[in-house]
Amino acid sequence: MRVCVFTEPHRGATYDDQLRMARLAEDGGFEGFLRADHYRSMELEGGLPGPTDAWVTLAGLARETSRIRLGTLVSSATFRLPGPLAMIVAQVDQMSGGRVEFGIGTGWYEREHIAYGIPFPPVGERFDRLEEQLAIITGLWATPPGGRFSHHGKNYRLSDAPALPRPAQRPWPPIIIGGRGPKRTPRLAARYADEFNLPFRNVPETAEAFERVVEAQERIGRPRDGRAPLVLSAGIVVAIGRTDAEARRRAAPLHVPSALPPEDPVIGSPSQLVDRIGEFAAIGATRVHLRLLDFADLDHLDLIAAEVLPQLDSGRDAARTYG
């Protein structure tokens, strides 16, 4: 089982907060450090010192870490135009020496769009735009050196784009698509993604989502077409401790009113987290993203590294392999 740290800096974290956690995760043997891409907290109050831009942050982390994989889980397609986004991700991939993972979704949190004047179309149009963005971004990355890329679609038009810079990873950085949508999300994941992620749901719901995406990839002939099957991953909200009191203290942020849908956290001991990871492994997950709630509580990360990672089959520093 491959284990990544997932964080939500929009709840209130500086770049330095994120750097400390990313470096500690790297030293602790976690495979990846991924972060949300939001501009406003889901909680009704708080969030100081405010949001940080995901890709600006990842560019900095790319130069200040050396082994850990870095990415978004996930970027909102409403925030950036596809041409510039392809350039941004490719450049950060170069800056990291080929350690970037590109998570992207439709965007869902209307409140942050209203706050910053970002258009927020109806959900059907957001899916249309996401699909077109995926076609454009992968098309740009697949263009041979010296070639040009054009696209004339319903929402975006590109003409003779130089398709530069090129990402360090070939054919491109791993693409992560996730979410609870039962129809278009599995189809898009099967067509474009290397990894499908269902965030922070219970095991039965996650199993149902995995079944839908596996069926979707089988319908398009994957992996018979030579592409690797999708990596299936789960997200787990984590608040564990050496004592029940310590675990409950770490779970306190979960009681703050939030716009997030209901989640299924692990609140308890390291062995309970190991058991939950095992349950996800039993339904096909080969990667988990552990959401930590407090950037200042680095002892929480140390505890997971010391008492959870050694109990997992793959051990530490497993190499990531995609088709």
Question: Residues of each region from the PLM?
Answer:
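Active-site-adjacent structural elements that line small-molecule/cofactor binding pockets in enzymes
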Residues: 1-323
